[in-house]
Amino acid sequence: MAIGGAEDKLGATRILRRFVAEAGGSDARIVVCATASALGPEIVELYERLFTRLGVAEVVSARPRDRREADKQEHADAAAWATGVFFTGGNQMKLSAAIRGTRFGDAVVAAYDRGVIVGGTSAGASVVSEHMVGYGSPGAQPKFRMVAAAQGLGLLPGVIVDQHFSQRERFGRLINLVASSPDLLGIGLDEDTSILVTDETDLEVIGKGSVFCVDMRTALTDAATARGTAPLMISGAGVHFLPNGARFDLASRTLVSYRDHSAVDPGDLPEPTHDLATISRRVASEGVDDSVVARNARRRRRTKAQHKESP
């Protein structure tokens, strides 16, 4: 399960609930890996409390800070014990560099191969694919040299995943990478939106936003010859915008079915506490691009100025 970040943690918690259900419900054994995050114990505590609120009896943390720690047997044993592994947000380059090819990373891959659900939000979503977005600039227009790729864990072959897709204007950088590697299917996840992949090719969309897919196997592009920061020429790309309830076949890259399941019963969850809400907001803002932060600050200043000018 790959989540676009900022998943609902205080309301119906539709995505996290589904993750718990796939992990075994009340019998689930969930390992939370917060290696990507700079928030440390705070983010571990958040997800431990969230999963406990959702009825999970056993939640443990595995947070190797580097490859040496990721090679410790205790972390590999945790992945072998789990019925669900969850990667938090943060920095996907930090996460991949720390765990890929280590005992812990290999144990997560082995767990996935035997049917354990592996999920991640934000940076944790990017790392599930073989090729992932390492870093890049926001913007709607695909340009040469606006993004760099890196290796992920390889749980989803043939795709490349980006997150916070609409909210952080990452259309251009995903298009850029797929134009350069047209055999890959580009998948952009909006916030509070996820994909659940079963049987290797059956993709289901869960959440309130959309999932953007781009297929360039038959498209025309000048990505191989572009120079500098020039805009790319792309013609004939296949695109899909998939909302909640859509099912998509990754092998044929076609829509299988669509049934809207927007209405969600929030169940009998207790009301979130103030500190839980505060931590959730801090987690949601982690990893925001500097340009987005600056733009939001300018917008707030303009709004304040307009209020002052109003009679």
Identify the function of each model-found stretch.
Residues 1-26, 38-53, 133-134, 138-311:
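C-terminal and late-domain segments of enzyme folds
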Residues 92-102:
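Glycine/threonine-rich flexible loop motifs
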Residues 87-89, 108-132:
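Catalytic nucleophile loop
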Residues 31, 37-82, 87, 94:
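Portal/gating segments that form or line small-molecule/metal binding sites
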Residues 93-94, 125-128, 212:
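Short gly/pro/ser/thr-enriched loop/turn and capping motifs at secondary-structure boundaries
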